[in-house]
Amino acid sequence: MSDIEIRLEPHDEFNHKPDEASNYNESMYFNVFDHSKKMGGWFRLGNRPNEGYAEMTCCIYLPDGRIGFMFGRPEISTNEVFDAGGMKFEVLEPFKTLRVRYSGKILLLENPKDMLNPGKAFKENPRVNCNADIEITGISPMFGGQAVRKDGQPLNQDPEKSFSKAHYEQHTAGKGTINIAGDKWTVDGLGLRDKSWGPRYWQAIEWYRWLTININNEIGFMFSIVHQSENSERRGGIVLKDGRYETIKDCKIETEYDEDNFQKTFTAWAKTDDDEYEVKGQVLSLIPLRNRRTTPDGESLVTRITEGMTEYTYEGIVGYGMSEYLDQVIDGKPIGP
């Protein structure tokens, strides 16, 4: 019998005292998609207080295929709040209601693949004003938390090989407004949010596939395949049905890629204790992102993350969400299947 359990308390919605690890990260992420307008976006703040900065990302998928994108590493002096670079997250009621706001510049990309060369993309595409204000409401239970020993002691982790020590997710609804360069949209959609904390290097995982899916208010999915090494791969996720979660015990994803090795279409299968599921995905709009780090011995590491607004079909019903594919890049090529 395992002496490890998953714990999640309302106070975990607020920020924690950082570990001593230099790469301590505490992050929140939200996505929301308006099914009728076929638009939406995602917002992320990752505090790295021991390094003195936050990672701020705003990504908006517009109905005409353009993408508004901004990334920054604003300085921070505390981990007590998520408020950096024009982005702010507030917990109004733990597990139930949160608020997402962004006010600042955004890069307006006619061709999102320009981000294959970020330096060139930021020089050649216009920066315009963006304001977003969205209230997020949970429509599901919480999933996840922190793995601890039953006596309350945390598990020992090597910070150099860590992606997080705690993680949870929740399917959500989102209502609010997005204003870009004077064009305003009222958003009434569905999505998913997550939170993680603990030491993180983006290079700690060889590759992963993460699908967030909202078919409607009653049906949703999250598929996760995390390949940490040849001998370590985790496949799982959740099915939202009738207001409760079923845990995915196993899953697989078969992907068709385009000429740039970006996900184009795919089929995902999942097994729970009670049922089996098949969901098809077609990417509508995608932006390629990357993270680079130089190790202490001078090795240059490159991680590619492709973020696709995706149309999903389950039993003939159409929904929307994200497909996020992370790969380490070796000899110029992503290493995942």
Residue ranges and their predicted role:
Residues 1-337:
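Structured soluble/peripheral alpha/beta segments that form catalytic or ligand/cofactor-binding pockets
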